[in-house]
């Protein structure tokens, strides 16, 4: 069937209805120098088979993670995604980014979101989780805003070890004037505890700790909760969900709000998005939580049902008085996360986290064999920074050799290791970097 959107008669009728004689008159406001003035020079049409071949040729110009081992992390990670995930995710019942506006006829997706919230709570050790936010950075900004509004304080203490893009997003929220950002210093790759505690005062709404932090280092969490709560401030933790397969949960550390980037949970890198932000908190703060919340209830027949609960917090009801302006969210990505966690299971997540950590330990040894040193003398999960004079040059070299290198820091290269990497790939990485730096 040919695509014929409007017949000449229909075009004439539309022009007549707006008082125009012809199409040239309709576009008279556009300067002639900006008009093409000729027909498009399109080639002959392609068959489906020819078009498929052509698109594959174009796609072949991209760097494919199936062909290029990737050691780039810094917030987004190349984890393996089980084949079953996409088959379930792309079912027509699920294939939307929206949380439903008519929940009584959308029980399937509501239950899926409820299961996602349950898994996030189990993972973080918190009481309540929402149906997702846009990404990890916006989740942190929302958490800081939540802390300020709940405590009626303005100061948000952010560490120098926080992901710089997260910092920029929080700064964009602070433009409103309701939030004042106070930066806490770092010492050897982790938060300077003594200097940071000295920043706490009566107007401090919260302290943020990223674990592992942007540099890959494991922060010393012990003692923070007691000091922060003694000041009647909130402790917000930013976490890598995969790391929770090995590390203590934020709930065990006494965190009040937990946020993070959910991309490692079954979501592809996908040129930077879409991703999802997860958020969980203690029950006492749930009425200040942004975004949708799905709850379990019973219907008039005493059957289990699922509902959007505590909607009075949201902007479609309270407008400018809402806890947040977030509306449509990343429900499809959240569903991917819940399918991923269901497929790998509790022990599977532990195994994935352990393999990531073991490969990072192995990589450190291989780097040290070539005389390379880590920038920071701290424990790490699956990411560390290697000291290099010119990390950009090393990255170019690696790319020429078919390897996607790390994130460039001043005088260092931040490298990430996931369960997809092999020891042979790490050996080659270390040999290329070490050989070039000798």
Swiss-Prot record:
It holds the Pfam family GDC-P. Keywords: Oxidoreductase. The keyword Oxidoreductase applies. Gene3D superfamilies: Aspartate Aminotransferase, domain 1, Type I PLP-dependent aspartate aminotransferase-like (Major domain). One of its GO terms (biological process) is glycine decarboxylation via glycine cleavage system. It is an enzyme of class 1 (oxidoreductase). It catalyses: N(6)-[(R)-lipoyl]-L-lysyl-[glycine-cleavage complex H protein] + glycine + H(+) = N(6)-[(R)-S(8)-aminomethyldihydrolipoyl]-L-lysyl-[glycine-cleavage complex H protein] + CO2. The keyword Oxidoreductase applies. CDD domains: GDC-P. One of its GO terms (molecular function) is glycine dehydrogenase (decarboxylating) activity. Its EC number is 1.4.4.2. Belongs to the GcvP family. N-terminal subunit subfamily. NCBIfam families: PRK00451.1. The glycine cleavage system is composed of four proteins: P, T, L and H. In this organism, the P 'protein' is a heterodimer of two subunits. The glycine cleavage system catalyzes the degradation of glycine. The P protein binds the alpha-amino group of glycine through its pyridoxal phosphate cofactor; CO(2) is released and the remaining methylamine moiety is then transferred to the lipoamide cofactor of the H protein. This is Probable glycine dehydrogenase (decarboxylating) subunit 1. It comes from Syntrophomonas wolfei subsp. wolfei (strain DSM 2245B / Goettingen). The lineage of its organism: Bacteria, Bacillati, Bacillota, Clostridia, Eubacteriales.
């Amino acid at each position: 069937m040919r695509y014929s959107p409007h017949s000449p008669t229909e075009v004439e009728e539309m022009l007549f209805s707006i008082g125009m004689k012809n199409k040239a008159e309709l576009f008279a406001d556009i300067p002639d120098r900006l008009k093409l003035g000729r027909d498009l020079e399109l080639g002959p049409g392609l068959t489906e088979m020819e078009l498929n071949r052509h698109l594959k040729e174009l796609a072949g110009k991209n760097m494919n993670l199936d062909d290029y081992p990737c050691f780039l992390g810094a917030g987004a990670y190349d984890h393996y995604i089980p084949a079953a995930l996409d088959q379930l995710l792309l079912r027509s019942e699920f294939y939307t980014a929206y949380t439903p506006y008519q929940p009584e006829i959308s029980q399937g997706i509501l239950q899926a979101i409820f299961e996602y919230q349950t898994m996030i709570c189990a993972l973080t050790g918190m009481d309540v989780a929402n149906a997702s936010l846009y990404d990890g950075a916006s989740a942190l900004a929302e958490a800081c805003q939540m802390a300020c509004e709940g405590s009626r304080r303005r100061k948000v203490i952010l560490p120098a070890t926080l992901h710089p893009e997260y910092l920029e997003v929080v700064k964009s929220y602070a433009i409103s004037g309701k939030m004042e950002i106070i930066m806490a210093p770092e010492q050897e790759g982790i938060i300077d505890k003594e200097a940071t505690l000295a920043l706490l005062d009566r107007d401090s709404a919260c302290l943020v700790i990223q674990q592992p932090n942007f540099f890959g280092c494991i922060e010393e969490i012990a003692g923070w909760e007691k000091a922060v709560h003694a000041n009647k401030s909130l402790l917000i933790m930013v976490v890598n969900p995969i790391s929770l397969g090995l590390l203590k949960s934020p709930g065990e550390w006494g965190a009040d709000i937990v946020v993070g980037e959910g991309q490692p949970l079954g979501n592809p890198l996908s040129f930077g998005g879409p991703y999802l932000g997860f958020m969980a908190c203690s029950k006492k703060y749930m009425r200040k939580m942004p975004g949708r919340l799905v709850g379990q209830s019973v219907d008039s027949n005493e059957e289990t049902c699922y509902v959007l609960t505590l909607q009075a917090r949201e902007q479609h009801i309270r407008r400018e008085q809402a806890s947040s302006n977030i509306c449509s969210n990343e429900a499809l990505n959240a569903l991917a996360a819940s399918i991923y966690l269901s497929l790998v299971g509790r022990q599977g997540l532990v195994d994935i986290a352990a393999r990531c950590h073991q490969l990072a330990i192995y990589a450190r040894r291989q780097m040290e064999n070539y005389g390379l040193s880590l920038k920071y003398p701290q424990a790490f999960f699956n990411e560390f920074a290697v000291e290099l004079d010119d990390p950009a040059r090393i990255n170019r070299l690696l790319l020429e050799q078919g390897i996607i290198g790390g994130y460039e820091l001043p005088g260092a290269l931040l490298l990430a290791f996931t369960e997809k990497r092999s020891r042979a790939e790490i050996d080659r990485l270390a040999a290329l970097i070490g050989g070039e730096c000798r």
